Amino acid sequence: MASHSNKGKGIAEGSSQPQSQPQPQPHQPQSPPNPPALSRYESQKRRDWNTFCQYLRNQQPPVHISQCGSNHILDFLQYLDQFGKTKVHIHGCVFFGQVEPAGQCNCPLKQAWGSLDALIGRLRAAFEENGGLPERNPFAGGGIRVFLREVRDSQAKARGVPYKKRKKRKKRNPMKSHDGEDGTTGTSSSSNLAS
């Protein structure tokens, strides 16, 4: 069978042209492969963790993560309010409770509840990924959950939009018999049984 390849053709035909031999390459040290790119969530979680740890180091005196408690976390969340972009109307404001205020006011900008809730979720995961024990996770404490609930409720009232908890969908029970398309029920009668 004839080959369509030219590989080895010069040798088979007695060609006098020298064949090029692959030369061994000198050993070059290889750099370690680049780690896989982090997902957006993982990158944000790492940034949040580094920011929180830096916040603790900047405290007077500095606080180590192993000594961090819910009071440090609550202080951090309140510190973040200065960078917030959500207008939260105070009780004395004429726009308090209005869904779409008609004008401007001097009410403070704060972190939105959803942003704080997501932040705590990422920090909770990062704490455990960095060696923290789940049962000692300060981000999972009851005080943090109460704070987030209060922020959610107060922001909802200030905006005039009540927070509604989503109802969980009931799963259909596949074991229940349903009426057939022909109007019969899922039960069989003795007349349908083979004898």
From Swiss-Prot:
Residues 162-175 have a biased composition (Basic residues). Pfam families: ALOG_dom. A motif (Nuclear localization signal) lies at residues 165-169. GO terms for molecular function: DNA binding. Residues 40-167 form the ALOG domain. Keywords: Developmental protein, DNA-binding, Nucleus, Transcription, Transcription regulation. Residues 1-41, 154-195 are annotated as: Disordered. InterPro entries: ALOG, ALOG_dom. GO terms for biological process: mRNA transcription; post-embryonic plant morphogenesis. Residues 184-195 have a biased composition (Low complexity). Transmembrane segments: none annotated. Residues 21-36 have a biased composition (Pro residues). It is found in: Nucleus. GO terms for cellular component: nucleus. Probable transcription regulator that acts as a developmental regulator by promoting cell growth in response to light. Belongs to the plant homeotic and developmental regulators ALOG protein family. This is Protein LIGHT-DEPENDENT SHORT HYPOCOTYLS 7. It comes from Arabidopsis thaliana. The lineage of its organism: Eukaryota, Viridiplantae, Streptophyta, Embryophyta, Tracheophyta. The gene is LSH7.
